[in-house]
Swiss-Prot record:
Subcellular location: Cytoplasm
Species this protein is from: Bacillus pumilus (strain SAFR-032)
One MF annotation (Gene Ontology) recorded for this entry: methionine adenosyltransferase activity
Oligomeric and partner information: Homotetramer; dimer of dimers.
Official protein name in the record: S-adenosylmethionine synthase
Principal localisation: cytoplasm
Flexible loop: annotated segments: 101-111
């Protein structure tokens, strides 16, 4: 590797990873509630370990959801359907401990500070306040068609492919738990030029040999996903490098909702505000504002206003307007960052109520995001992935 080149690595996990099981359970419960009560307040946390699922949190809703059934259906769909996998949807215990949202938090969310103090316009009076303080980041760059960094894009595609060949029985000996990792080499212009390393660890049946797993994964998982022009004779492969991965899922490691926030976002390529997504309704800005920030960043890059763009939003609990908006184009901007913030403020309503309306977030669309990333998903129709504002932004920022 020449002196001016650098390596960057991102990882992904499959839907059978213990932490991802929890994310999917939390978002399945959220979706079931939103189907019947779009205005519900949900903060649902899940923990899994050998033979046990614990669902806890704060839920305020007018509807009833059969939580144990939702939990079991989700685990079954992931593929933990036999006791020999160490976790079984039919026989695992499901415990629930659910409270209502705190009245102190609710008063700030139900009516924003601006409404309580009379500083909002009539049009704004119904706006909700942010459900918490915090900072959220959104990012986009032009490394891939979906405007995501290449390392996380490839890591997710490998994880998704790993699940596909398990579920369609191409590799019937695979089991649900798995992880992927991709290291990309960048040149001195910060352009990806080759794949340096691919790591895949997958749970498997005990009778299969390591040699067969390595051969099959190269043929059926890596080859269909990783662009051949980025692979050379120096590319390294580590496939099940421990030699054996039979004990996996919640039997191998306990899992928790919100433990895979870098996998969920940009693979470490952009900054992260620290808040997790799954199990939270859209009044929680941890989720909705991170989606809005991605929407803004993606439209800026799609408009040709920058090759790379990171957007930061920040909120105070119970206050509707963001306390700050920051944009960094890393020296690639075609307009000043001040100008970009100006056109963003003019074209995106970044109050919580505005985000919910702009992205139509009171729908049951969340479970599908709970594995393989919330961003850059061409296989899903996600509102924050649209580039419908790109033309307007270009016109207003550059006058063309």
């Amino acid at each position: 590797m020449s002196q001016n080149r650098r390596l960057f690595t991102s990882e992904s996990v499959t839907e059978g990873h213990p932490d991802k099981i929890c994310d999917q359970i939390s978002d399945s419960i959220l979706d079931e509630i939103l189907k019947k009560d779009p205005n519900a307040r949900v903060a649902c946390e899940t923990s899994v370990t050998t033979g046990l699922v614990l669902v806890s949190g704060e839920i305020t809703t007018s509807t009833y959801v059969d939580i144990p059934k939702t939990v079991r259906d989700t685990i079954k769909e992931i593929g933990y359907t036999r006791a020999k996998y160490g976790f079984d949807a039919e026989t695992c215990a499901v415990l629930t401990s659910i409270d209502e949202q705190s009245a102190d938090i609710a008063q700030g969310v139900d009516k924003a500070l601006e409404a309580r103090e009379g500083t909002m316009t009539e049009e704004e009076l119904d706006a909700i306040g942010a459900g918490d303080q915090g900072l959220m980041f959104g990012f986009a760059n032009n490394e891939t068609e979906e405007l995501m960094p290449l390392p996380i894009s490839l890591a997710h595609k490998l994880s998704l492919r790993l699940t596909e060949v398990r579920k369609d029985q191409t590799l019937a000996y695979l089991r649900p738990d798995g992880k992927t990792q991709v290291t990309v080499e960048y040149d001195d212009q910060n352009k990806p030029v080759r794949i340096d390393t691919v790591v895949i660890s997958t749970q498997h049946a005990p009778e299969v040999t390591l040699e067969q797993i390595q051969s099959d994964l190269k043929e059926h998982v890596i080859s269909p996903v990783v662009p051949s022009e980025l692979i050379d004779e120096q590319t390294k492969y580590f496939i099940n490098p421990t030699g054996r991965f039979v004990i996996g899922g919640p039997q191998g490691d306990a899992g928790l909702t919100g433990r895979k926030i870098i996998v969920d976002t940009y693979g470490g390529y952009a900054r992260h505000g620290g808040g997790a997504f799954s199990g939270k309704d859209a009044t929680k800005v941890d989720r909705s504002a991170a989606y809005a920030a991605r929407y803004v960043a993606k439209n800026i890059v799609a408009a040709g206003l920058a090759d790379s763009c990171e957007v930061q939003l920040a909120y105070a609990i119970g206050v509707a307007q963001p306390v700050s908006i920051s944009i960094d184009t890393f020296g690639t901007g075609k307009a000043s960052e001040e100008k970009l913030i100006e056109v963003v403020r003019a074209n995106f309503d970044l109050r919580p109520a505005g985000i919910i309306k702009m992205l139509d977030l009171r729908r049951p669309i969340y479970k599908q995001t709970a594995a393989y990333g919330h961003f850059g998903r061409h296989d899903l129709d996600l509102p924050w992935e649209k580039t419908d504002k790109a033309d307007t932004l270009r016109q207003e920022a550059l006058g063309q």
